[in-house]
């Protein structure tokens, strides 16, 4: 028969009831599986948010005083500086130069060395040891002649730091010596303890305001001034008592956010941490009931592999089920995790082998259907061969307890089987019927251990991340970086621009005079003072009338009565614009503007004039004598010469010339850092550098706010009096009493333009009337036009100091300065450590053979000198007869260095003599003359951090370095916001 197509996969069945068999024993724990290999690296995550701005860094250590540079060429004379603010209290003067080194006085008692600091935990600095007691100063001896420089001894190990002696009395100023070669830069010392702050100096009194001067024309750029002569150094002042702590200053304005710093160098890979402790193994879960094979679900996401579970015990033996009808072959389900090995089932009946069906096409993954009815149990198939034990799968989740099933039917009694081996005790069985008491059997031995499980398959995903290892020991403290050179003193910032003065309001335009009214025929009686009427609109000027004929002169009228004081007339029209006002007084200084944006880096400026040479620092205390050197290397074995007779001791030769300095030895490894010296006093402020080029004009500021109402303008000048009309004809009879004023007539229409008449005779001035009452306030005039800008006011006092600006980008390195003038010689320093062994000098000329002398007397034993460098083999003298070996006398005193003798004839080569015993190392001699500075060697390897108490005494304070060149003027920043409007100027 042809097999039909493969049917769809059935729905997943419900979990079956648990079998009636008893629960199996808990199996022994399985061996822990091997850790799975790391999975592939995941995709790179998105970049994290930018980090917060770091906290403000701590203040840097005080810079080491720079080496004294050569004085630069004389610069051009600088512009006269503006008057500075009252200066603060100056520093104490430097101590005077010491004279020539005197003979050492009797040494004071040596102070006990301070106890060294305790070594702290790794990475943390231990507490600093207490300083030893201060030794008494020895009496100052007379100034002795300077001795010749001895050869440099070998460097001994650094001795412990002794107590610092008190400073000696200042000696007389010695003659100026030649400038020595530039010494190599010393190693960085540890940061010293910060001293207590001194009391704040008194604030200087503000000077009186000067009279406003006239604006002068900008003067031409003056030549740079010559550097001033260095003042005589003062004596060291006694250290004053520490002043009380000054009041805390007002918090400064919040600075702008700093730009992100350059990425730091990649740090060294940290030490691999120790593996974390192994986690506690969890208890094994109970074996779940085997459910029916469900339909294949959609593949889920790859999960992380769980920890290897313990090996489960064997399950309970189930009852064989009844044979069911074989169903159609379903699709292959997913490979399940192998369950615990069950007991071997009883063999079933062999079924007929079915015909092999054709493999069906793989169907699409269907959605999970609703659960179908339970199918009938099929007949058991033939027993297959025992398969290889599968790899242990990951532990399954603990299943929910199944519904208690119904007990199965009681099976027929089977044939008794063969007696099996005694197994491990089973779980308690169900209570059976009471049987006969049997004989107690002996307890069987424990069963053999099961075979070790095979290694499970590698999980699809990387394992869980292990617990973090314990923290490693703290790393050693790094070597402190070299102290930076103190920066140049910045040039004084420019004074803030003075705010513009407000413009005075423009005076209004004067209105035209009104037309003259008609002259009355006769003078009426003065009427009552009327109330001031409303201000009428300004009329146009009427046409000028024709000049009438001159009438006859009338009789002189009687003098009229004094008029009553009239009411104040209406406010006149605004007068014409006044002339520009005088120069106003300087207004108050405006508030400091906000900090401008950071400007772009400026162009490279011209080098500024060199600053004056600083004062020489106080001499450092004499160092402790160096440790005894180690024995030198044995010299090469020379050729054996015939022993000549011992010659007499010759007189000491004259002092020879100082030989040429040998080549510079190899650079030694960095020694322990010395103690930080006291910071040098601030050098004198050099002359201001030349002004930078003016930056481009900034963009125009925003339109100013609308100005307030201007002050009331002055009353305009009185208009010209009108022309006097012709006198009227004389009236008949005597002058009657004045009549009452008639009602005001209606305004007439303007008449036609008349012919311009001739100018009338100017009338006599009338009497001055009484002052009228103040008039009512007139309507506010229109805002005046912008007047001409006033002349610039005087320079106001400097405004308050603004907040510190952002640090500009580092400028380019300045050009190398010209060599400076020779400094005054410092006093002789203490003997330095023994230098590296130099190279062998050139071979000297052979000496002339000396005459054999009689053996000299045995001299007193002298101190062993430093081991000299191996000189070239000199010429051997003529072989003399072997003399008798005399007793070894004590070593004589070290003779003075003799002059180089004339070149002798080359002698015969002698036989090699026996090697003498190595001499004991001698005491350290005085320092030799410094050779010329060699090329800068490669940086040495970082030394291990030094311990407290082992550093040397503070060295002398070096002279302040020359003033660096003034940097270029940066670009002009954006204009600040407009200042508040100034006060109105005088009218």
From Swiss-Prot:
Compositionally biased intervals (Gly residues): 309-318
Modification type 3-hydroxyproline: residues: 687, 959, 974, 977, 980
Ranges annotated as biased composition (Pro residues): 1-21, 157-169, 642-654, 797-807, 843-858, 972-987
Glycosylation sites: 89
4-hydroxyproline PTM positions: 15, 18, 20, 29, 32, 35, 50, 65, 71, 80, 86, 113, 116, 122, 131, 137, 158, 167, 170, 197, 200, 212, 218, 227, 233, 236, 251, 260, 263, 275, 284, 299, 305, 314, 320, 338, 347, 353, 359, 368, 371, 380, 389, 395, 407, 416, 425, 428, 446, 468, 474, 480, 486, 492, 504, 513, 526, 532, 541, 559, 574, 580, 601, 607, 610, 619, 625, 643, 652, 661, 673, 679, 688, 697, 700, 721, 730, 738, 747, 765, 774, 777, 783, 798, 804, 810, 819, 825, 846, 849, 852, 918, 921, 939, 954, 960, 975, 978, 981, 984, 987
Keywords tagged on the record: Extinct organism protein, Extracellular matrix, Glycoprotein, Hydroxylation, Phosphoprotein, Secreted
UniProt PTM: Contains mostly 4-hydroxyproline. Proline residues at the third position of the tripeptide repeating unit (G-X-Y) are hydroxylated in some or all of the chains. Contains 3-hydroxyproline at a few sites. This modification occurs on the first proline residue in the sequence motif Gly-Pro-Hyp, where Hyp is 4-hydroxyproline.
Keyword hit for Aminoacyl-tRNA synthetase: no
Something else known: These protein fragments were extracted from an ancient skull bone collected in Buenos Aires in Argentina.
Name of the protein described by the UniProt record: Collagen alpha-1(I) chain
Originating organism: Glossotherium robustum (Ground sloth)
